[in-house]
């Protein structure tokens, strides 16, 4: 029986035949590129910016793509000393968040803010891999940070986070239209039912420990205050009432 892993890859199982997901490396790249543009890092000169990091569950293979994709963009600025992490918490396992939990993200950032930013040090940017962790960061900032609001990334366009984008409490989120993923998965199932090859566009990236799994990667999109209306409301993904409730 063919098995299609949906969005999250099943690891260490030879039962998985195909994988339908988003281009998770590109999710991280988009977050990194947003930070570069928002801070104009290419023209930073001798300026330095303080950055902190948070990603998701250490058992979720996707964090490797989200986090590493973003770091691939930011690394030159880290190496040049333009981006500095006052907490020193930079390793993926250190900045991971069990179960992607908002309360755990909030608790960790409240500790970071108290330990490294309570003296007036400016926090310039937080690379958050997704919206549930970004929400925890935003909650921590609201409760215990008095500096200029940092650039804050996210992913998923959860309703609470889109509200934060509108309110200026989150800079961006990467939109992964689940309608696209569902539609592509249906195509894959239909092909298998007909005895034909399902659509795939990646045969190199996703190794679940038993081999590379043929995958279809849907395209993620940046969501900001400038395009959320078109991307989320006009497309029918959310209604105005969803965001005003």
Predicted regions and their residues:
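A residue-level marker of the well-folded mature domains of exported/periplasmic proteins
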Residues: 1-245
């Amino acid at each position: 029986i063919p098995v299609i892993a949906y969005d999250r890859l099943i690891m260490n199982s030879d039962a998985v035949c195909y994988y339908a997901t988003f281009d998770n490396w590109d999710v991280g790249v988009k977050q990194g590129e947003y930070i570069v543009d928002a801070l104009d890092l290419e023209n930073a000169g001798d300026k330095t910016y303080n950055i902190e990091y948070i990603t998701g569950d250490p058992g979720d293979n996707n964090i490797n793509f989200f986090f590493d994709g973003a770091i691939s963009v930011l690394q030159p600025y880290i190496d040049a000393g333009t981006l500095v992490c006052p907490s020193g918490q930079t390793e993926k396992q250190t900045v991971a968040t069990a179960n992607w939990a908002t309360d755990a993200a909030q608790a960790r950032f409240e500790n970071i803010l108290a330990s490294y930013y309570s003296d007036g040090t400016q926090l310039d940017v937080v690379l958050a891999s997704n919206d549930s962790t970004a929400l925890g960061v935003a909650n921590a900032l609201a409760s215990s940070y008095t500096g200029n609001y940092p650039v804050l990334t996210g992913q998923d366009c959860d309703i609470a986070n889109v509200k934060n984008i509108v309110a200026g409490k989150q800079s961006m989120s990467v939109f992964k239209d689940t309608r696209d993923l569902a539609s592509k998965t249906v195509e894959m199932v239909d092909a298998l039912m007909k005895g034909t090859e399902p659509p795939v566009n990646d045969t190199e990236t996703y190794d679940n420990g038993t081999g590379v799994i043929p995958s279809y990667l849907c395209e993620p999109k940046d969501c900001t205050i400038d395009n959320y209306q078109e991307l989320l409301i006009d497309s029918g993904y959310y209604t105005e009432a969803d965001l005003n409730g």
